[in-house]
């Protein structure tokens, strides 16, 4: 097929205990999301964590980068959809997404204690100032658990909105090596007289080297939050940090709430801005064929610090490009490579079978279609019915051909 529909155990110990609290929810096009309860010693409470695994995670052996996200309940669905859309279009790597839900949001996401008082002289946010402890929870409990019980690559992204954006900036300047990239959406840098903004300005002025990507954004938000964002963007424009990539984007047609969806889209595009394999501008064909595509992903491996395999769907596209240009033999070799690299995928067998069938070699196509339907059933592949129909059609055709020869 030319396209493919895509859709743990946790660390048990003194510090952390994960317990599955509800069934996994599989949604077409957005992988599988599990809702887990976490008992944290650092925070002294139980937290709910949502973990989204990519389509095919249960049936392959691939490892994935991880996007950690605050406000997990609010943003998991649209973020998973954004990731799936970008992955299908070859723009980013597929990701495991870990969304942490809230108990005391202000406590966890604010670096500084609040001194603001109400008319009665009482603190408006008496629990504020726990961001360092929340970051410790990420570093010592959450991330080790995820990395033990899920197949992850050594690449971490942190995304947060509003106070979560403030937390992302605080994390970057407090522990710049803890995450590889940051997405800070409408960061509340006006918090407590711009305390975190001032530290960020000093950090950006004095830091010498940091292999990190930062994407920051804001909607049409006047007042202190907008002014603080502009100050951050100004500080970013003056920095000379080696290996540091950044983008600060205003979206004047969005507000404080609606800006998140597009920010996650553009933030991931910034982090993975060179991800897409180069194509010929005239024909749209992948430049350099399979060798050129493999060379591109080798460069990405060097940039991201882990082995980045050429994606199955991209190799599949290359095969169909060749098939469409009448280069059947070359297409078959590409499809064979996909079978070698992704033997657990039903679709790779189906595609190779189709190439053989188009060339009139139904005797070679039939067992491959059979393999595709067997794997499709085993993997609960949404395209199983198509694989089965292809096998039955070619099997019947082969029997008819054999019967004719006997006459």
Map each language-model feature to its residues.
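Bacterial N-terminal signal peptides
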Residues: 11-22
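Non-catalytic cap/lid and distal C-terminal segments of serine-dependent acyl enzymes
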Residues: 27-359, 368-404
């Amino acid at each position: 097929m030319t396209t493919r529909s895509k859709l743990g155990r946790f660390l048990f110990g003194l510090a952390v205990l994960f317990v599955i609290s509800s069934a996994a929810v599989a949604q077409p096009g957005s992988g599988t999301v599990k809702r887990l309860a976490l008992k944290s010693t650092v925070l002294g409470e139980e937290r709910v964590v949502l973990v989204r695994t990519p389509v095919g995670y249960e049936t392959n052996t691939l490892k994935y980068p991880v996007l950690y996200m605050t406000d997990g309940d609010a943003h998991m669905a649209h973020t998973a959809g954004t990731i799936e859309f970008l992955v299908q279009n070859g723009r980013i790597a597929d990701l495991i997404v870990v969304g942490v839900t809230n108990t005391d949001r202000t406590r966890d996401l604010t670096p500084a204690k609040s001194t603001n008082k109400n008319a009665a002289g009482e603190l408006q946010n008496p629990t504020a100032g726990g961001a360092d402890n929340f970051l410790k929870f990420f570093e010592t409990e959450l991330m080790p658990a995820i990395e033990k019980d899920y197949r992850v690559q050594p690449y971490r992204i942190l995304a947060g909105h509003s106070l979560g954006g403030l937390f992302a900036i605080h994390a970057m300047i407090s522990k710049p090596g803890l995450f590889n990239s940051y997405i800070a959406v409408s960061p509340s840098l006006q918090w407590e007289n711009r305390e975190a903004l001032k530290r960020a300005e000093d950090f950006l002025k004095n830091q010498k080297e940091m292999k990190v990507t930062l994407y920051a954004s804001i909607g049409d938000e006047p007042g202190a939050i907008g002014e603080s964002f502009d100050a951050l963007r100004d500080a970013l424009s003056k920095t000379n940090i080696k290996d540091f990539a950044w983008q600060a984007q205003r979206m004047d047609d969005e507000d404080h709430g609606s800006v998140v969806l597009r920010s996650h889209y553009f933030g991931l595009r910034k982090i993975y801005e060179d991800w897409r394999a180069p194509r010929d501008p005239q024909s749209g064909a992948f430049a350099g064929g399979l060798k050129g595509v493999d060379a591109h992903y080798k460069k990405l491996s060097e940039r991201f610090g882990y082995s980045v395999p050429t994606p199955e769907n991209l190799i599949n596209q290359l095969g169909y490009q060749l098939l469409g240009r009448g280069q059947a033999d070359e297409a078959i070799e590409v499809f064979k490579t996909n079978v070698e690299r992704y033997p657990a995928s039903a679709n790779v067998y189906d595609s190779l079978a189709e190439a053989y069938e188009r060339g009139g070699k139904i005797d070679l196509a039939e067992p491959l279609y059979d393999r595709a339907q067997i794997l499709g059933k085993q993997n609960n592949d949404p395209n199983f019915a198509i694989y089965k129909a292809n096998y039955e059609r070619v099997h019947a055709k082969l029997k008819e051909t054999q019967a004719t020869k006997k006459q």
